C-alpha cells in the first residue's frame, strides 16, 4: 500500500509538487495539472520538462487525473474532443509508467 495525492493542490509547478510529496514521506503523485494545464494538454516541450523533473526524483506518477469526460464538458459535445484527450493521455501515461487514469462524469444535463 502507498499514499498518493493530487499534488497541484500544493504547488502549480512540478518541482513544488515533487517537494510537497516528498515532505509528506510519499513517493507517488496522481498528476492532474502542471502550471495550470492537464498533463494531456501540455505541449511536448513542457511535458518533457515534467518527465525530466520526475526522473530520478524518487517520486513517480501513479495515475493521471485527466479532464476526460469531466463536469466542464457536455455529453452532447463532439466526442472527438474526448477522443483527442484519450489519444494524448495514453502515450504520456506509458512514458511516465502510470497505470491508472481518473476520469469523471459529464455534467448533469438540465
Feature annotation, model-predicted:
Residues 105-110:
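Short, intrinsically disordered, charge-balanced linker/junction segments flanking boundaries
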Residues 1-100:
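N-terminal pre-domain/capping segments
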Amino acid at each position: 500500500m502507498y499514499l498518493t495525492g493530487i499534488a497541484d493542490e500544493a504547488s502549480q509547478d512540478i518541482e513544488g509538487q515533487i517537494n510537497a510529496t516528498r515532505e509528506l514521506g510519499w513517493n507517488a503523485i496522481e498528476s492532474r495539472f502542471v502550471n495550470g494545464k492537464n498533463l494531456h494538454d501540455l505541449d511536448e516541450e513542457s511535458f518533457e520538462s515534467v518527465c525530466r523533473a520526475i526522473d530520478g526524483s524518487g517520486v513517480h506518477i501513479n495515475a493521471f487525473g485527466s479532464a476526460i469526460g469531466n463536469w466542464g464538458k457536455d455529453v452532447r459535445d463532439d466526442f472527438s474532443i474526448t477522443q483527442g484527450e484519450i489519444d494524448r493521455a495514453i502515450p504520456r501515461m506509458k512514458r511516465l509508467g502510470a497505470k491508472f487514469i481518473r476520469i469523471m462524469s459529464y455534467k448533469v444535463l438540465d
